[in-house]
């Protein structure tokens, strides 16, 4: 049974809240929040444990003074992975931790997204949340534990937040005892491998009314979801497919655990009893400024928001904003100052724009570009654009334009991950680039920002379940998505471009995948709450909506989902209908993609040809040779790259089939030898000259001797070197093989 217990050590000032999570047949997990022992000078510090081995220190600290001139809340979240957490020394040159790993950056985003909306609006003091990973079990992922730790530290910090955030990872596990699947909270790495689908869900507690009664409920704030790598095979075996219904069921299954974790944090905060501090708040604009802007701009702005083209609409609305500012600034600059008055007028103008668009969507089903609520923008699909790339594609959806590029290489080129994540290698790598010109702007170009890493991870998660196994396709795969134009969901465009590019590169995907971005707008209309789901949202609709979610999948099931909402809860039917609307769009996009390419093309002439052979494990050392002598010689002679796995699998990569065949022949001769027979002829190489004859190499590791008496073609030879030299090619025939395997050779005399 899931429950919360509290312990207090008054001697040391340590307070604990322990949440026990009951997974039924799959056992229990314990989340423990502890405060009072570590990092006492931080505004809030909580040590969070998952069972006994995973331990994180979460701290929240706020600056004393607000940052001047900011029009946003300066919250930063940092995850510090300490390699001592896994009993390892960092592999870097200086043997200390450097820049954060991809996994740490993704954990930062996972924490920031549900935590940021809980802060009071108008806060301008810098707030820094730092999670230090101090110990981690190889069986556990720390990211979801960090969501709870960061929330608990913030909740007891005295900062103005609306409440605690609870986060949980849910895995749908189907086995012989649970053929329909059971949702398991905080699954171990072993349970994750056995799962069909995973959800990371974060939410908070809200008060609801039903009649005269008030009760507490969980409002979902964020969802990250993905299918397992072997989901296609699991479905064939009878496991449930992760459909839209599965997602809805998983969200409901997560709510009791989120409720438990939030109650544990709230109980901890009550026992710490730190008062909420007073902070100056800076609302974006005053009511007077908004009223003036609304009166001045409402009518014309409503007309401008019907301009379909993004650039034309933005230019027109920006010009009109300058006009409105010039007319109104004189009214407010004496009281506010010119700079503040300008900022408030512009903020009020943007807020009015949002109100106009939302109102027309809810009352008329109006969209900025004239589409219906479920319409997809015009699609453009093309493959094979880049001459020397192994695979390439261009996917366009309205003004969003994504170039997908695929590169194939040997498995030794897969990414080796030096982080605290349970996974240590990555064979399929998806990298996403978002240059400033994609939105018609200038900006910094260089190492990827957190947003780019997050979008790449989402697209990677969407495509990974359909990537063929390393046995079926022994290649490392790097997929790059270049966002060349952006006006709504470049991440889902990247998923579509990836499918096209991978097919063009000859990758035999288990199924094609497409993605779509959805939005939801909600408000009171005539006393009733109305919800409108929008398919294929524009950038402006993303900013103006109450919820956005991105769904990727095949025609049969969902492979990835990401959801963020500002609402205090979404009715189950509204979410189910929105997911079904997304499925219809996904099927339409898949159909358009299939008209251009619906299966793997022939591999590019520039892509390496990789073949595999199996050798006995006992022969691995012999194939490598002393200090790599044999394998280096094979590489040099054939021009092929050779990689050997611990189980005796040998991967051979070559630019041509001839080079690969030559390498296979030589490897088999060495590691899978067949004894030569008497009478067989070879074109061998003289490798050694002695006083009694010449040794000739027939096969790698297999030499024979031509006696000096056989070298002269019937004539007496005084010195072997008078007839042959080391390195010379010599046609020989096996004359005899003795019982010790020693081979006697005779030169082959060409007949006239």
Swiss-Prot record:
GO terms for molecular function: 3'-5'-RNA exonuclease activity; magnesium ion binding; polyribonucleotide nucleotidyltransferase activity; RNA binding. It is an enzyme of class 2 (transferase). It is found in: Cytoplasm. Mg(2+) binds at residues 542, 548. Its cofactor is Mg(2+). It catalyses: RNA(n+1) + phosphate = RNA(n) + a ribonucleoside 5'-diphosphate. It comes from the Bacteria. Keywords: Cytoplasm, Magnesium, Metal-binding, Nucleotidyltransferase, RNA-binding, Transferase. Coiled coil: none annotated. Its EC number is 2.7.7.8. Residues 608-667 form the KH domain. Residues 679-748 form the S1 motif domain. GO terms for cellular component: cytosol. Its main location: cytoplasm. GO terms for biological process: mRNA catabolic process; RNA processing. HAMAP family: PNPase. Belongs to the polyribonucleotide nucleotidyltransferase family. PANTHER family: POLYRIBONUCLEOTIDE NUCLEOTIDYLTRANSFERASE, POLYRIBONUCLEOTIDE NUCLEOTIDYLTRANSFERASE 1, MITOCHONDRIAL. Involved in mRNA degradation. Catalyzes the phosphorolysis of single-stranded polyribonucleotides processively in the 3'- to 5'-direction. This is Polyribonucleotide nucleotidyltransferase. It comes from Corynebacterium efficiens (strain DSM 44549 / YS-314 / AJ 12310 / JCM 11189 / NBRC 100395). The gene is pnp.
């Amino acid at each position: 049974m899931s429950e919360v217990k509290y312990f207090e050590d008054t001697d040391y000032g340590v307070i604990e809240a322990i949440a026990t999570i009951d997974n039924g047949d799959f056992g229990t997990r314990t989340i423990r929040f502890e405060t009072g022992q570590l990092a006492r000078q931080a505004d809030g510090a909580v040590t969070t444990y998952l069972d006994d081995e995973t331990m994180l220190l979460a701290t929240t600290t706020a600056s004393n003074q607000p940052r001047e001139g900011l029009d946003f809340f300066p919250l930063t979240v940092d995850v510090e992975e300490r390699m001592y957490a896994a009993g390892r020394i960092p592999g870097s040159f200086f043997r200390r931790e450097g820049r954060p790993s991809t996994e740490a950056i993704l954990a930062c985003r996972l924490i920031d997204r549900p935590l940021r909306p809980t802060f009071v609006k108008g806060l301008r003091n810098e707030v820094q949340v730092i999670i230090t990973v101090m110990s981690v079990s190889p069986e556990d992922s720390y990211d979801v534990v960090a969501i709870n730790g960061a929330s608990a530290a913030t909740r007891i910090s005295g900062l103005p937040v609306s409440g605690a955030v609870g986060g949980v990872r849910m895995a749908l596990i189907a086995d012989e005892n649970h053929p329909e699947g059971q949702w398991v909270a905080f699954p171990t790495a072993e349970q994750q491998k056995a799962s069909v689908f995973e959800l990371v869900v974060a939410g908070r507690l809200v008060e609801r009314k039903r009649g005269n009664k008030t009760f507490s409920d969980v409002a979902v704030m964020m969802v990250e979801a993905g299918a397992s790598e072997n989901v296609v095979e699991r479905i064939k075996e009878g496991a449930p497919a992760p459909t839209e219904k599965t997602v809805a069921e998983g969200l409901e299954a997560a709510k009791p655990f989120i409720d438990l974790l939030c109650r544990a944090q709230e109980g901890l905060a009550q026992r710490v009893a730190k008062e909420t501090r007073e902070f100056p708040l800076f609302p974006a604009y005053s009511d007077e400024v908004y009223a003036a802007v609304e009166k001045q701009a409402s009518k014309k702005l409503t007309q401008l928001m019907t301009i379909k083209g993004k650039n034309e609409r933005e230019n027109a609305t920006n010009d009109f904003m300058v006009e409105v500012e010039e007319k109104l600034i004189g009214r407010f600059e004496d009281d506010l100052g010119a700079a503040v008055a300008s900022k408030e007028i512009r903020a009020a103008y943007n807020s009015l724009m949002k109100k106009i668009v939302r109102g027309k969507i809810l009352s008329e089903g109006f969209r900025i570009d004239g589409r219906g609520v479920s319409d997809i923008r015009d699609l453009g699909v093309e493959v094979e654009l880049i001459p020397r790339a192994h695979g390439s594609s261009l996917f366009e959806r309205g003004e969003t334009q994504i170039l997908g590029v695929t590169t194939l290489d040997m498995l030794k080129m897969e990414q080796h991950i030096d982080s605290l994540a349970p996974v240590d290698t990555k064979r399929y790598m998806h990298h996403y680039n978002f240059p400033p010109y994609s939105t018609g702007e200038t900006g910094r170009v260089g190492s990827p920002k957190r947003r780019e890493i997050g979008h790449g991870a989402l697209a990677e998660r969407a495509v990974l379940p359909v990537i063929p196994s390393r046995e079926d396709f022994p290649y490392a795969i790097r997929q790059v998505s270049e966002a060349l134009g952006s006006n709504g969901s470049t991440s889902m465009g990247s998923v579509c471009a990836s499918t096209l590019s991978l097919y063009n590169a000859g990758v035999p995907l288990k199924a094609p995948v497409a993605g779509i971005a959805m939005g939801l707008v909600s408000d009171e209309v005539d006393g009733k709450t109305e919800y409108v789901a929008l398919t294929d949202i524009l950038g402006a609709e993303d900013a103006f909506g109450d919820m956005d979610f991105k769904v990727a999948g095949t025609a049969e099931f969902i492979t990835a989902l990401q959801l963020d909402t500002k609402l205090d809860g979404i009715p189950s039917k509204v979410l189910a209908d929105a997911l079904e609307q997304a499925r219809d769009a996904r099927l339409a996009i898949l159909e358009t993609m299939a008209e251009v390419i619906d299966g793997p093309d022939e591999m590019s002439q520039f892509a390496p040809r990789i073949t595999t052979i199996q050798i006995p494990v006992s022969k691995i050392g012999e194939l490598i040779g002393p200090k790599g002598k044999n394998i280096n010689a094979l590489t040099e002679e054939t021009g092929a790259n050779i990689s050997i796995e611990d189980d005796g699998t040998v991967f051979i990569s070559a630019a041509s089939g001839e080079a690969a065949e030559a390498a296979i022949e030589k490897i088999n001769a060495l590691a899978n030898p067949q004894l030569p027979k008497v009478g067989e002829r070879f074109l061998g190489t003289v490798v050694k000259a002695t006083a009694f004859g010449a040794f000739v190499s027939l096969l790698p590791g297999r030499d024979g001797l031509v006696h000096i008496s056989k070298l002269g073609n019937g004539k007496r030879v005084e010195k072997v070197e008078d007839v042959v030299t080391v390195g010379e090619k010599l046609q020989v025939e096996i004359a005899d093989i003795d019982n010790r395997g020693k081979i006697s050779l005779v030169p082959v005399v060409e007949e006239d």
